[in-house]
Structure formats: C-alpha cells, structure tokens
Amino acid sequence: IAAVIVTCNRIELLKRALKSVKEQSRQPNFVYVISNSTADNFLKEQKLCADFGFQILKNYRTENYAGALNTAVEQIITESGISNDLYFASLDDDDEWLPNYLQEIENNNSDNFDLLAGNLLRSSNTENNLLALPNELSEKDFLIGNPGISGSNTFIKLITLLKSGAFDEGLSATIDRDFLVRVFLQKPKYKIVNKHLVTQHTDNDRERVTTNRTKKEESLRVFFYKYQYLMNKVEKEQFFQRIEKLFSISK
C-alpha cells in the first residue's frame, strides 16, 4: 500500500492528516507527501515530514492537484515498479483517516479487488453528515454528481489507476469525479465497505477547491464536454440542475 498526501500551503491541516497516517493500525508500506506549496512553506513541510519519518517531494508536473497525484504515481512506479498487488491510497491534506482505515480495507480485500471504498463523514461547524455509499456503482453515478468517493477514500490498484488514464491535469477541480468515471468505464471489480472510515473536513471558513467558483465552473464545463456523449437527455438536465443548485452555475 502506497499512501499519497497532496498538500498546498496548509501546514496545520497537513499535520493532522499526517498524524492520521502515522496512527494507522496497518501501516502503509510507502508514504509520499507531494507539495504544491510556496518555497517557504515547502521548507516547513520538509521539517514536518521529517518529524513523521515521511518523504516529501515537490510536484514536478502541472501545478495543480492532478499534477501532484501524477507525480506520486510516477514516483511509485520508479521506486516499486508495477505489480498486481500494489495499491494507491490517497488522502487530501484537510481530511483524516480513522486509525483502522487501512486495516479495514485490507480485511475486506478478500478477492484482490481493483477498488475499495469506505464511507465518508462530512464534518464542519455546520454539518455532520455520514455519506453511505450504495453497494453498486457505475460510471453513471459520477456523471451527474458524486455519491461519496473523494480523494481521501480512494483505495485503488495501481494497475487499474493506470488503465484508467491517471489524473487529468487539464482540470483544476472535479478531478475525483472525472477519474472515477474513467475507472468505472473499465468495469472494475470493486467493493464498498459500509463503515465510516474517513472524515472529510468541509469547513467553509477557508478556500477549498470545491468552493472556488471560477475553478469549479471551468472544470465542470470541461467535464461536460468530455462526457456528454455518455449522458442521455435526462442526465444532461440533471447535471445542469445540480450545478445550478450547488454552485449557482448556469447552463
């Protein structure tokens, strides 16, 4: 298991995320922290990662979230090659894994699944909402919205990730959904673990990619142009109704 944490100028939040990796009852075999931060903050992150015993790299691809994830993918392949039992487990710097996350996922991986996902708890001052994933998913679920898989509860076989085309660096938001559409088009063997294993912190008093309207609008337009061929008329309407309701973005 390779754990991957992408960070961008959020030292205090990163510390919480790294602590949640360090406290895993089943430790990852490799940990990669990839930084999109300023030079000053990168120095602070290096010190923090050294305290945890984790390696940190500067994102050397496109300077966004997808570029950082792909930097990690390249690094994993360089150091470990590609094998059928190597898994990629990502965590956003503002989220945290429960201490039993990796152990629970591994315990449920009885059939060498391509993808496993546990439930997210969305947590902030204004919400405490457990997103229960349906037991069956397809690419259709990610065309309209997101039923509850994010960067922080994605546990995927490296080979499946590569077959799906890795992460689209042309997008600055909607990266998880875009990736999962392509993953589910592969008809992967997957398992939903119906337990709360990851806490997704959704505080609105700081900028998150999800709340940056310009990035979101631009990425949703690209997403629609990429995948409209998979949507029927009703699904297209649902897509636009959702973005109007959630982000006030009009057709």
Identify the meaning behind each predicted range:
Residues 19-28:
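Short, acidic, metal-binding catalytic loop of nucleotide-sugar glycosyltransferases
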Residues 33-45, 61, 92-95:
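A conserved acidic beta->alpha catalytic loop
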Residues 59-80:
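Glycine-rich, basic loop-to-helix element that forms the pyrophosphate-binding segment
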Residues 83-96:
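Short beta-strand-to-loop acidic/aromatic patch adjacent to the donor-nucleotide binding site
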Residues 96, 100-129:
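Conserved donor NDP-sugar-binding/catalytic core segment of glycosyltransferases
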Residues 119, 191-197:
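Catalytic beta-strand/loop signature of glycosyltransferases that borders the donor
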Residues 173-179:
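Acidic donor-binding loop at a coil-to-helix junction in glycosyltransferase catalytic cores
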Residues 196-203, 208-237:
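Catalytic core of nucleotide-sugar-dependent glycosyltransferases
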